[in-house]
UniProtKB/Swiss-Prot annotation:
This is Sec-independent protein translocase protein TatB. Residues 133-142 have a biased composition (Polar residues). It comes from Mycolicibacterium vanbaalenii (strain DSM 7251 / JCM 13017 / BCRC 16820 / KCTC 9966 / NRRL B-24157 / PYR-1). The gene is tatB. InterPro entries: TatB. Residues 89-142 are annotated as: Disordered.
Amino acid sequence: MFANVGWGEMLVLVIAGLVILGPERLPGAIRWTAGAVRQARDYVTGATSQLREELGTDFDDLREPLSELQRLRGMTPRAALTKHLLDGDDSIFTGKFDQNGKSEKPEQKPEKPQSAPGPAAAVPDQPAGGRSGSTPYDTDAT
């Protein structure tokens, strides 16, 4: 719950506690909060052990689908689609449809023919902005 709270935030909370509660009531409030958290943790641990005792082996059967849900929660949308709908075949995302490594398409020729060295070769291929004419394509950004 407080995984993202750093030392700076804790210092702000302590200063706010000093201002709101005052120095005489702050230690008591901290003790009360720590005791309440400890008691809640004991209740949760007791409930878990009681469920484990009452359900026996069924408790592990209940935990199995929950662990699968946790694994799914950590997946990216692309990984979930690849695993469950495409049976692990991510060629639709990568564009590598050829499984044996041989390309069925003939080798493509370059768009611009190379010119002979000379004054015409000094003209840059890129526009004045310094960017090439083609925009990079990111399959994960869609």
